[in-house]
């Protein structure tokens, strides 16, 4: 596996990541047991980056539970996405962030991204300031 260094955080991150959008268990999608196997295999292959999002139904909870069951949270750089179109004020950022920490069963999120930034809801100065506060 090739790795890159994030110049801002200094994190050593795998050149390939695992997108977890299809977890969990919708028809034809991996169930929790299969998600565990996929995440475990990815880490064995040197992947250190997992990507999830608030807007993927049940996804953050599935990924968080898998990382907890497998004991892999400290080996992973975890990214999730804020549903920015649902944020109307800075307090919404706090609410979503806290909910996402709970779903992911973690005390921190390594990379917190805005989801669907091309939506018709403009990214306001308030949004950016709230996001900056969480950084």
Question: At which residue positions do the language-model features occur?
Answer:
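A generic structural signal for short coil/turn motifs at secondary-structure boundaries
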Residues: 25-28, 52, 86-88, 120-122
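Active-site groove signature of glycoside hydrolases
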Residues: 104-120
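Short, acidic/polar
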Residues: 30-41, 89-103
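Single conserved hydrophobic/aromatic residue that forms the stacking wall/gate
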Residues: 127-135
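N-terminal binding-site loop/beta-alpha segment at the start of enzyme catalytic domains
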Residues: 1-76
């Amino acid at each position: 596996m090739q790795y890159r260094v994030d110049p801002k955080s200094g994190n050593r991150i795998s050149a390939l990541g695992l997108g977890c959008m299809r977890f969990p268990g919708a028809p034809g999608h991996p169930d929790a047991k299969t998600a565990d196997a996929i995440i475990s295999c990815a880490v064995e292959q040197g992947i250190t980056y997992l990507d999830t999002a608030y807007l993927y139904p049940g996804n953050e909870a599935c990924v968080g539970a898998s990382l907890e069951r497998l004991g892999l949270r400290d080996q992973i750089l975890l990214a999730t996405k804020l549903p920015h179109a649902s944020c109307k004020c800075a307090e919404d950022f706090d609410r979503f962030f806290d909910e996402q920490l709970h779903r992911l069963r973690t005390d921190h999120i390594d990379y917190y991204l805005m989801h669907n930034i091309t939506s018709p809801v403009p990214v306001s100065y308030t949004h950016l300031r709230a996001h900056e506060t969480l950084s």
